[in-house]
Amino acid sequence: MGAQAQTQQLFDNGWHFSHDGKTISVNLPHDWDISYASNPETGATGTDGGWFPAGKGEYRKAFATPKGELVKLHFEGVYQRAEVFVNGQKAGQHAYGYTPFTVDVTPYLYKDKRLNEVVVKVDNSQQVNCRWYSGSGIYRHVWLQTMPLLHIAENGVFVTTSNISTKEATVNVEVTVQNEAANAGQAIVEVEGKQQQVELQAGESKSVCFSYTIQNPHLWSPQDPYLYTVNTKLSTQNSPCSTKFGVRSFSYDTEKGFVLNGKPMLLNGACVHHDDGVIGAMAFDDAEIRKVRLMKAAGFNLIRTSHNPTTRAFLDACDSLGMLVIGEAFDGWRTAKKPYDYSTLIDSCYREDIHAMVMRDRNHPSIISWSIGNEVIERKEIAVVTTARKLKAAVLECDKTRPVTEALCAWDRDWEIYDPHFEVLDIAGYNYMIFKHATDHKRDPKRVMWQTESYPRGAFRNWATVHDYPYVIGDMVWTGLDYLGESGIGRYYYEGERPGESYAEGGQPDWHGACCGDVDMTGWRRPISHYRSMLWNDNEPLYMAVKEPNGYHGKIYETSWSVWPTWESWNWAGWEGKPIDVEVYTKAPEVKLYLNDQLVGTKKVSRDTEFKAVFTLPYEAGTLRAEAGDETVTLATAGEPARLRLTADRTKLTADGQSLAYITVEVVDKEGRVCPDAAIPCEAIVKGQATLMAFASADLKDREIKTSPRATTFKGRAIIVVRSTHKKGKVQVSVKSSLPVATISIN
């Protein structure tokens, strides 16, 4: 058998999409929900999904039959209940919207020069099926794959490391070879110069193992995310399979806590949903990378992919940028949280979906744990222990190198009843329940815990718990980023507005997203983000913000996931002479605050003050200045809006139809200070080799369609997202408003 090419080609371009009686041309990734306005009157996804339409859609694409003994289509994610047809014949299907799947289309392809047609039918009409914004459609990449009949299996290279020291490390490579031919076959597998012959019967798969040594290994860590590459060759394939991996070791116990590469490490984590904010569920690589960059900049070292498998690009970014990950499989199990959620699939699909996640992701050094569930409803039933064991067993069938966890919670007094459930887990996940740690540790001194969800306002208490008790190895705030769906979580409200929590009867129809993130939809870090980062890290020594006076816009009421409205603003017109609180965050022992160069006061700062100094003073416009040791920060009253300032996150776009640029729009005064209360209607105009993907603000009550060219700034900010075309050339983005036109160019 001669060597043949094994190829993988991006299959995102040139689709025709039909929905709601209309057909349009689209390039993937695609989410049809985000092109609609959130509408509480008609949105089938309800308050959980942000009031979007969902429904059914159909994608079609014509393509020539490629060369290769086997031809497959690999889908990174379709939401949801996908059926794949080729030339009128059903080739495959997949139900769960968050796991990848592959369809062998070889038997259905034309053998002549006729073009083939693939049709993907997407059914997201059974609502409600998700507790957050899922999006609808082929929202992740699709790949066209070709390979010989005898080939390296999908996800068939598994790299682990052992015997790690500063002098050397052992690399273990397990290669699974698959024979899809009707006859027996043989091939030679080569890894790093070592060879083994493998013989396979028709339809058989076999694994062969290799090991080699790296001298003076460069260890992977969040501070130094160094990656190696191993090349695997098969004699029937004429190109090697390259796999990136990291050399790192970690351990956890009740005495030393979490230890990475021999060094204790406190885990400062964030829960992050799958959506990409203003562009909805469309999982462009650049959007996924941006999420990781934002979390890294906010001081986090751990992300929990709540509550579903994430994308390949997201994990690649975590590997290369240095971010630890808990990979989560499911939200719920057998008892439904929503009428059409995973409870309708679990018995028939759980093993397939867990394998899809773990097999794809197990080479990522960023992943330190697998999570099998979140706040399952049936948690008090004894049968839940059996379910947990089955799910854990499915994980261990693919990867025995990482601990299995699960997030549990209780809204009543029956906590100890979960002990048999916790016994199944390697690390116990506590949602909002870490205050039970002392009694639980006394009852079960071997239990290692982490808080898998916590309220944003509990930042100091949660940091202190992890800092003081090694058996509590980390905390994960809900959430790192604002997200679509779970409408109104994190909101505060004023007297006269609809009261209550986001989950109140009827939901919060004024909202279509959750504002509990440390970082908002535009990428702006809220003051709570700076405070949290100051607690956990040493690179944010001083920060200052101002608490909104109660009564300035009305009497303020908080909800469970909210923090008091606090802003980088010294613009409080009409409040002159009235008391206002200025907060300064630092680990320095003393802070001085000045207003207009006059000393307001000096305050001691320590753990007893939660590393926070609060000054109450009568409001007067001008400039605040805080000093702590050698550090100084200022906050000045902004003048009237004078212009728009546009700032892009990159200077060049790649002409591949996949490259995104995020352009921040800020309303500034003549001195360049952001006007923190500016709400100015704007229109974006994109010329050249890019198209507009989205224009929106962080206001999750704004009903403007996010893909429209119109948006109103919120707190002086908005964000524009543009997508490259397939042609090289300059891109010009202009924004019109009542202020002078602002323009920025990108190559």
Stretches found by the model and what they are:
Residues 34-62, 69-86, 92-95, 145, ...:
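Active-site-adjacent substrate/metal-binding segments within catalytic domains
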Residues 110-113, 174-253, 618-621, 635-639:
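Extended acidic/polar, glycine-enriched regions
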Residues 184-189, 222-228, 579-581, 587-589, ...:
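Short flexible loop/turn segments that cap and initiate beta-strands
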